Amino acid sequence: MQTDSLSPSPNPVSPVPLNNPTSAPRYGTVIPNRIFVGGIDFKTNESDLRKFFSQYGSVKEVKIVNDRAGVSKGYGFVTFETQEDAQKILQEAEKLNYKDKKLNIGPAIRKQQVGIPRSSIMPAAGTMYLTTSTGYPYTYHNGVAYFHTPEVTSVPPPWPSRSVCSSPVMVAQPIYQQPAYHYQATAQYLPGQWQWSVPQPPASSAPFLYLQPSEVIYQPVEIAQDGGCVPPPLSLMETSVPEPYSDHGVQATYHQVYAPSAISMPAPVMQPEPIKTVWSIHY
């Protein structure tokens, strides 16, 4: 009886006769009386395959592999009553066409789990990488089809992000430095109206901000239980303003109210007071 050479993996191994199931390949076991059938159309059912292969021998079982959704993966297995019927199909595999479509027929091999690095396996000559009609890839080498289960890699969840709060800083000096703008408000009197002019320097500069000696209150930052930062309420501090002077005109007095923040220094809020007319009598 003519024997075929089997190769259960891309690595070359010694030929194994099909009529001797005890001489199994190195990395798999030949299932007796069973053949592998690939290239099956997804419309083909098990009854159609049984009817087709029954003309070549006594068919015991037909199994088409489906996915979880019940859709055919494009390959299956046919088990015959005797090994001779299975051997006959393998010898005529190149001549078998089902509905004008060539079938990939080979021995059924149960693969064994071996610890071989995938990178060390080099594909041999004559190896074909095929895809079923439903998109499942497999390797066809020396009449044997190999289906590789895709490796599932678990992605670790990202570390939860936490906000880092800085410790409260107590400043007792009346002069402090902070990346902020230097605001200077001046009042100019024009006939018939008031005009406020607030010049601003370029944003790249970070000059000192000089305040009059006054009480500066800082509140520490509270840390929430979830690791976030709870900003404290803004504390307002009022600077002293020079005494109003008398002139042959009208001068408006105002207070500059500052709202310090942990990020930037906002613009001063101008609160003009009611206009006071100062009369001076010269003798």
From Swiss-Prot:
- Entry's PROSITE patterns? DAZ, RRM
Known SUPFAM superfamilies for this protein? RNA-binding domain, RBD
Q: Which residues form the DAZ domain?
A: 160-184
Source species, domain of life = Eukaryota
| GO cellular component entries | cytoplasm
Q: Name one GO biological process term.
A: 3'-UTR-mediated mRNA stabilization
Q: What molecular function does GO assign, one term?
A: mRNA 3'-UTR binding
Subunit architecture: Interacts with DAZ1 and DAZL.
The main location class comes to: cytoplasm
Q: Which gene encodes it?
A: BOLL
Q: Where is this region: Disordered?
A: 1-25
SMART domains according to UniProt = RRM
| Organism of provenance | Macaca fascicularis (Crab-eating macaque)
| Main function | Probable RNA-binding protein, which may be required during spermatogenesis. May act by binding to the 3'-UTR of mRNAs and regulating their translation.
Q: Which UniProt keywords apply?
A: Cytoplasm, Developmental protein, Differentiation, RNA-binding, Spermatogenesis, Translation regulation
Q: What is this protein called?
A: Protein boule-like
Similarity remark: Belongs to the RRM DAZ family.
Compartment(s) where it occurs, according to its Swiss-Prot or TrEMBL record: Cytoplasm
